[in-house]
Amino acid sequence: MQIVILKDSAEVAAYGANIFIKQLQKKTNSVLGLATGSTPVSLYRGLIEACDAELISFKDVTSFNLDEYLGLKGTHPQSYRYFMNEQLFNHIDIIKAQTYVPPGDAENPLEACVGYEEKIKAAGGIDIQLLGIGRNGHIGFNEPSSGLMSRTRVKTLTKATIEDNARFFHDDEYQPHLSITMGIGTILDAKKVVLLATGENKADAILATVEGPLMAACPASALQLHTDAVLVIDEAAASKLSDRDFYKHIENENQKLMAKLP
């Protein structure tokens, strides 16, 4: 894994956005894996600005989101389809029919999971997958104990995840306890993975992901198996890593090398 430690959340978002901008400039018909939550919002703003400046275009892009609450229609304000429309899709030149989010209102969720995998395969696979990380190390809605080679499926959310996401729902509003999520195996199939994490509350999860053993108790630790995974984190999220200075040294040397390449 490539570990990039930056000062704060603004630098993390800018660095992450630049990775996606370079990908779209290199391959205009890229297949993007996208994520929701508070961490990617600033990254999406960077992509919107780049699109407005005509540095990139999304006209030929296909996107697949990681997950969706089971039981919410795409028009529900807390659905991830609604989130993506509001935070990104409504502000760029992407064709909405080429944006896919797991159907939270599917009549047969099990069939919908199989169909989602088939759509990803038909698109040629995901070129670059964006991830956040939960306090318990979950990626997507792959909670601890998830199989490390799992595929898109229905998952029950843990108490910790439900509590973390409760702030998005009103006290009298239904909050789903089930989801449809890409599996860890689905995520690992992406050609490149970019995980963003900020804040001290993510420090334990980052420690387990980077320096802990490969284990189902920390789903994000599966990224140790990926040949092109980049973790972009701020100082607070990196605060419990024992080799912070070494990771910074490696990244500095990598940047020097990249600057010399044609």
UniProtKB/Swiss-Prot annotation:
GO biological process: carbohydrate metabolic process; glucosamine catabolic process; N-acetylglucosamine catabolic process; N-acetylneuraminate catabolic process
A GO CC term attached to the entry: cytoplasm
Catalytic site: D67 (proton acceptor), N136 (for ring-opening step), H138 (proton acceptor), E143 (for ring-opening step)
The reaction(s) this protein catalyses: alpha-D-glucosamine 6-phosphate + H2O = beta-D-fructose 6-phosphate + NH4(+)
EC numbers: 3.5.99.6
Pathway the protein takes part in: Amino-sugar metabolism; N-acetylneuraminate degradation; D-fructose 6-phosphate from N-acetylneuraminate: step 5/5
GO molecular function: glucosamine-6-phosphate deaminase activity; identical protein binding
Protein family: Belongs to the glucosamine/galactosamine-6-phosphate isomerase family. NagB subfamily.
Subunit architecture: Homohexamer.
Record's keyword terms, sorted: Carbohydrate metabolism, Hydrolase
Protein name in the entry: Glucosamine-6-phosphate deaminase
Main function: Catalyzes the reversible isomerization-deamination of glucosamine 6-phosphate (GlcN6P) to form fructose 6-phosphate (Fru6P) and ammonium ion.
SUPFAM superfamilies linked: NagB/RpiA/CoA transferase-like
Species annotation: Shewanella sediminis (strain HAW-EB3)
Pfam families according to UniProt: Glucosamine_iso
